Amino acid sequence: MRAVVELLAGARRLVIFTGAGVSAESGIPTFRDALGGLWARYDPAALATPAAFADDPALVWGWYEWRRLKVLGVQPNPAHRAIAALSGRIANTRLVTQNVDDLHERAGSRDVLHLHGSLHAPRCATCAAAYRDALPDSVEPEEGRRIEPPRCPACGGQVRPGVVWFGEALPEAALREAFAAACECDLLLSVGTSGVVQPAARIPGLALEHGASVVHVNPQPVRTRHPREHCLVGPAGEVLPELLRRAFPG
């Protein structure tokens, strides 16, 4: 860890790239975790498509509401808090996430780039206007239920979850900003991500190509292929606070 501590202590332009492993440590089921009740009959990937929403909006909206309320029932973990603290230590820090929850924001991170959208930012399926009315915060039954989506105040269209579905492109502006940050950083921390979901998986490679060091933090070893690539094995909630403490003592 010593080499990584020195890299972090000397970093001037930091990118932190997070994936599902960070949220899983707060108790959020990953996308393909086994589901019970109503959802046991469906492949999650089959619910996460524009066609599924067009065919049965109440089913898809109900599933995403179940997921959103699951998120509201958990708290940011030490990894989220350490990531937020790093932005206070390194002024030029950019946080890019593949996660659709709001745990980074609740931990204190600002201006988070959500490459796959957010459960907490629904929009109209017709006119794309942001839906700003309050969503319910009551607990959904564990077995799930169908819920009719609200209507857009602007055009009357159905409101859809604000996530990126299979077959949809990632938000162009967010992806462009993430790629630019990776090309300009001197250190990139890749935390809790499998590194296989394209095009976001290009981000660590772009950082390496442009001269940065890359550190993978993951419970399982990550094969490194470059002298400037490092791997710290362990839960992010343990590794990141220790890394923060050692790089910025006091």
UniProtKB/Swiss-Prot annotation:
Role, per record: NAD-dependent lysine deacetylase and desuccinylase that specifically removes acetyl and succinyl groups on target proteins. Modulates the activities of several proteins which are inactive in their acylated form.
Domain Deacetylase sirtuin-type span(s) in chain numbering: 1-250
InterPro entries to which the protein is assigned, alphabetical: DHS-like_NAD/FAD-binding_dom (IPR029035), NAD-dep_sirtuin_deacylases (IPR050134), Sirtuin (IPR003000), Sirtuin_cat_small_dom_sf (IPR026591), Sirtuin_class_III (IPR027546), Ssirtuin_cat_dom (IPR026590)
Cofactor(s) needed by this chain: Zn(2+)
Domains: entry comment: 2 residues (Tyr-64 and Arg-67) present in a large hydrophobic pocket are probably involved in substrate specificity. They are important for desuccinylation activity, but dispensable for deacetylation activity.
Matches recorded under HAMAP family: Sirtuin_ClassIII
First-tier enzyme category under EC: transferase
Protein name: NAD-dependent protein deacylase 1
Swiss-Prot/TrEMBL catalytic activity: N(6)-acetyl-L-lysyl-[protein] + NAD(+) + H2O = 2''-O-acetyl-ADP-D-ribose + nicotinamide + L-lysyl-[protein]; N(6)-succinyl-L-lysyl-[protein] + NAD(+) + H2O = 2''-O-succinyl-ADP-D-ribose + nicotinamide + L-lysyl-[protein]
One term under GO cellular component: cytoplasm
Residue positions binding NAD(+): 19-39, 98-101, 192-194, 218-220, 236
Gene name of the encoded protein: cobB1
A GO molecular function held by the record: protein-malonyllysine demalonylase activity
Binding positions for Zn(2+) per the UniProt entry: 124, 127, 152, 155
Location within or outside the cell: Cytoplasm
Catalytic site positions: 116
Cofactor binding, per record: Binds 1 zinc ion per subunit.
Binding site for substrate: 64, 67
Keyword line: Cytoplasm, Metal-binding, NAD, Transferase, Zinc
Organism of provenance: Pseudomonas aeruginosa (strain ATCC 15692 / DSM 22644 / CIP 104116 / JCM 14847 / LMG 12228 / 1C / PRS 101 / PAO1)
The UniProt record lists the keyword Metal-binding: yes
Family: Belongs to the sirtuin family. Class III subfamily.
EC number: 2.3.1.286
PANTHER family associated with the record: NAD-DEPENDENT PROTEIN DEACYLASE SIRTUIN-5, MITOCHONDRIAL-RELATED
Record carries keyword Metal-binding: yes
